[in-house]
Amino acid sequence: MAGSSPLNHHLWSSPSRTVEEILAEDRNSEARHRYLLELARKEHERVREEAARIYREQLAREERERLLAERRKEEERIRLEQQIAAENARLNALKATRIEIPPLLPDPVPAPSTVNGKPTLPAAVATEAKRCPSEPSLVNGIASNGVVEAPAAASIKTLEPAKPAASAFKAAGSATTAAPVAPIASVQPSTNGVVSAVASTPKTAPPAPTETPPDRYVEIHRNLKGLRKYMAEQAKTNLKLKQRMGDMRREIRKSVGQLTTGGMAANKDKQQKIKSILTEALSNQVESALVDPNNFVVEPRKPVEGATNNDPLLPSIFVYLINIFAKAAISQFINEAGARPETADPVGICVAAILSEPDFLWRGASLIDILIAKFRIVCPVLFGYRGSEKTEQGRQRLGWWKESGQWISEQQHMDRMTGLGAGFAAISLRKFALSKKQNPYPPRFYWMAMAKIVNTPPAEISNTQCVVLKAMVQNYEAKFIEFYGSAAIAALRTALIDFPARAPHKSAAVNSLEVLAQMLKRDTGLDLG
């Protein structure tokens, strides 16, 4: 090996030992082996110590990263808590702020607005308002006695609402006497489609009321809450009532929730189910106590010759289930018709069909006031109430709902108003010309609700009113025109053209009315411009 080439010597040499050392004579000696083992042991110790050092450094780095991450989390938590505390402080400051709103001065009598020299709908209905002071319209807490009536030749009687007694559900309530009849104007369409007013002014006008009467629909709603508590008290001692009342309530809610847009035939079995439940309730098989229906209607009623139910009292379970039926209908309008307004129509058909049943009338008229009282609470703009959407009082007046003590979002509010506006139209624009039944809520109430909205002063127009008005018109313009002809066209022109034009702020809700007018022109050829 001594004569090997330098290349081979370089390739086979060890970093720590030379070839001569490897091939030395004592390479297999015990001392040589001990020496090599000691070198290997020292190398092993060095590698182990180096690995342990690296491992300790890695653990230290990981611990440092963990501590940094914990610190960042705590800093983020503190930052968020500081933001929440600041927001709560600002919110509390806003809640504590109260702005004193001075009372409004009486509005001046506006001059009749004209289009091409001809009076428009607001001028005509304003003439009616002077002759119909029966239902005061509140504006920001101020009572206004001007109320717009539907175009009809007949007069509407107004009665002082009955005051609920402490024992309203245990004894018959006392009826109040009727007030003098207030004649109203008769609105007739002219040949060119413009509304004109023909007034029937009495020789001696009744004196104006000195104070605003209480809101009867609010009283009815309060009485219905009392009835619900009264039924719960009865159920504690009447086991038959307790067992059946819950089943009947659930069946009515279920049937109303299953109403579809497939037509009357598709919903016939649901209507029949509701009718059979109410018929059973009217027969009072569960032996519920009797109540005075005058506590749940706007005007006290006297016996009517030939009426099916002329008794002064009705079974409380029947009135209670009418209330459940009305509540289920309102829930459908809010939860379903808000996103799909067309779903309000089958519910409106069912409401009109059930409440117009001759067996369910009391002293010649339906109990639809129970349903309308709920409309008054959840959608006050239909009854002439208005207010600012930016104030607590204004939102309350507009029917802006609260959940868990907090106002719902604007989108939720507008969806509710859309469903309720469509539901109101679905109930009030039902055709009974070919039916032997009595229409529980004639179209004149639709006209009145529309007039109360479009007669709003420009400064008080709200997005809520625009959303409700659009929902009332969309999908129901044909029915409206079918009832009132050219007068309805003039009313639609006022609602979709003139009313949004007077709004001081052109919001999306205001513009949607003008867009609806354009859609009607495109889809039906109805030109309101």
Curated annotation (Swiss-Prot):
Give the UniProt subcellular location, in the record's own words: Nucleus, Nuclear pore complex; Nucleus membrane
Keywords linked to the UniProt accession: Coiled coil, Membrane, mRNA transport, Nuclear pore complex, Nucleus, Protein transport, Translocation, Transport
| UniProt topology in membrane | Peripheral membrane protein
Mention any one GO cellular component term assigned to this protein in its UniProt record.
cytoplasm
InterPro entries, per the entry: GLE1, GLE1-like_sf
What biological process terms from GO does the record include?
Answer: poly(A)+ mRNA export from nucleus; protein transport
Per UniProt, what is one Pfam family of this protein? GLE1
The record places the motif (Nuclear localization signal) at 227-234
- Kindly indicate whether the keyword Hydrolase belongs to this entry: no
- What does this protein's UniProt record list under function? Functions as a component of the nuclear pore complex (NPC). NPC components, collectively referred to as nucleoporins (NUPs), can play the role of both NPC structural components and of docking or interaction partners for transiently associated nuclear transport factors.
Q: Which family does it belong to?
A: Belongs to the GLE1 family.
* Name of the protein in question: mRNA export factor GLE1
At the highest ranks, the source species' classification is: Eukaryota, Fungi, Dikarya, Ascomycota, Pezizomycotina
UniProt gene name: GLE1
